[in-house]
């Protein structure tokens, strides 16, 4: 028998965090973060990481499990989630995967397999040096020549994954897209997949407001503190927003340019998330546009959970 799993996805700033806590409190769930950057300690403001006082007593997993200079791959994420789900179910709780990193979510719900491979840090450093020497877009163009499928999926600014894809190709001669396979016909869990959406103009306004709030909360100081302990080229420091603030601190961008770039790149990231999740045919979409939409969506998700698993009661057990 397949284990139960609720999957809650949506673009950045749509409101997944607060809604997921409300649902988890109602049905007795534990939340597994599906965000590839919230795994890193000390990267709190810029990743919109939930604060302990916001968790409402709901256990959260896969947050603050790595230092920023440590590697964290989708394969490791998949393995950790696969270990967590039976543990959560054994406690009589409902596992709920919440996030916006599409590949991470898909690796859990579909039958993805990954080719194990050691990291080549010298090769990665050389590739990053080539990008700095030749300018933005150089490595993406190289990737397009050897692995067009991955290049089409990755944004030219997603240097982390572009470097990883080129690393795999140089090590094996095989595109990384060919080493990741999925059987889409058979889900790995007895899942309920929910997608959150919102009017695009309202979402973009929320993104701009959230960036301003993060900066006012001390995001730049957070980046300064990280740079004291870690070099700017480590994987985590290439994350959205952190990279732009590092460029500002190095004098390569003005403050106004950095803020504008963060907002623009975050809006573009949200658009790519929409595109990715729209491909998931099993998602039930709920619109969060409007003042009462969030409460209605919470009630609807709770209803769907109890409809799918009728024995699911508050803090109860799925028999």
Swiss-Prot record:
- EC nos: 2.5.1.75
Annotated region described as Interaction with substrate tRNA, given as residue ranges = 35-38
**Residues bound to substrate:** 12-17
Q: Which UniProt keywords apply?
A: ATP-binding, Magnesium, Nucleotide-binding, Transferase, tRNA processing
- Kindly list the residues the record flags as site (Interaction with substrate tRNA): 101, 124
Keyword ATP-binding (UniProt): yes
The cofactors it requires, by name, are: Mg(2+)
Please name every pair of cysteines joined by a disulfide bond in this record: none
- SUPFAM superfamilies under this entry? P-loop containing nucleoside triphosphate hydrolases
Q: What this chain does, per the record?
A: Catalyzes the transfer of a dimethylallyl group onto the adenine at position 37 in tRNAs that read codons beginning with uridine, leading to the formation of N6-(dimethylallyl)adenosine (i(6)A).
Q: What is this protein called?
A: tRNA dimethylallyltransferase
Organism, by scientific name, is Symbiobacterium thermophilum (strain DSM 24528 / JCM 14929 / IAM 14863 / T)
Report the gene name.
miaA
